[in-house]
């Protein structure tokens, strides 16, 4: 079995000085590793009987779409403001780089639908908190949040738990 953590590459000073970027593309490029990641996410997600996967732009789409396919669920996009063509609901989405907004189409999640949220990486937890808020405002029931990587030194999982203690959080790799 592939060691997912060993494939992730540190890129210093990207996207700006002082940041050490975790490059996940080697996991995506390696068929065995990528399939392992999706299989492990699916194993966890199945515990919650999701009816939909919603993923955060943009690298979250890679894992979210593959997970939705594996789970045979619908897939919803959570995008930055102004990227979706139809009527949307918007929430504030501050992150470690800037203050942004997340949007989803109003019809992307049905009332009461059980939703697993996916992103590539959990850093400060701000994106996850905003995405969960958006799903709830759309009428969905967030049942889990998952990512390939957690940067545990940034306490993102703690921030998510403080905001939404009812939503379990999972990451396959922790730094």
Regions found by a protein language model. Give the residues of each.
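PRPP-associated nucleotide enzymes
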Residues: 1-175
